[in-house]
């Protein structure tokens, strides 16, 4: 499958929204996560619409804080006009809020998992790729920072809520998206749980 000009345009739009944004607690440009998720979607068989939605999967959620004057409503219209209704619908399934400040983390994540329980397979593909990329990042960062990671990554959620959220997401994908992607996510979630359970014995510093 060749990716065309719509995909190029989606990359440009994502960079426009995320240009000033970094991964939580790091100096890593946020677009690195966007590209990582998109790569996973393609590696696990995604089509161009799914790849476009993966590129744009966080723009509606982050535009109010980082989008340099754009609004979620205007951005939704732009996505639908430039990339079609399918891409917009998939991005909406990936969005847990368009408000800034964001509502409380537990409330947002519970509602998002409920929405994913009704989501089409294309949205589940993107969501599972997003979780896989995040869990791999958490494993890498935990090995470096240990328990300090949770304060840096998401102090509102902390360790137990974060681990519980990824376990709940995994169980949803096991029920609704069986296959290689969910199998790989399960291996990584278990690896993260075991690493944390070891109490920092596998943490490398310096």
Segments and roles (model prediction):
Residues 1-206:
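Active-site helical microenvironments for divalent-metal-assisted chemistry
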């Amino acid at each position: 499958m060749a990716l065309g000009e719509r995909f190029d345009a989606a990359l440009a739009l994502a960079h426009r929204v995320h240009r000033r944004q970094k991964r939580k607690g790091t100096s890593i440009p946020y677009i690195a996560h966007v590209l990582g998720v998109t790569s996973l979607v393609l590696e696990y068989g995604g089509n161009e619409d799914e790849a476009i939605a993966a590129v744009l999967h966080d723009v509606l959620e982050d535009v109010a804080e980082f989008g340099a004057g754009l609004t979620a409503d205007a951005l939704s219209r732009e996505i639908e006009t430039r990339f079609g209704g399918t891409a917009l619908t998939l991005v909406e399934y990936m969005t847990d809020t368009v408000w800034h400040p964001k509502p409380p983390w537990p409330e947002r994540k519970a509602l998002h998992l409920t929405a994913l329980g009704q989501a089409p397979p294309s949205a589940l593909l993107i969501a599972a790729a997003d979780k896989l990329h995040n869990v791999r990042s958490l494993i890498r960062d935990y090995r470096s920072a240990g328990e300090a990671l949770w304060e840096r990554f998401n102090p509102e959620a902390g360790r137990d809520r974060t681990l519980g959220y990824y376990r709940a997401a995994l169980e949803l994908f096991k029920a609704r998206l069986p296959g290689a992607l969910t199998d790989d996510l399960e291996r990584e979630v278990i690896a993260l749980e075991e690493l944390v359970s070891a109490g920092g014995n596998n943490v490398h510093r310096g």
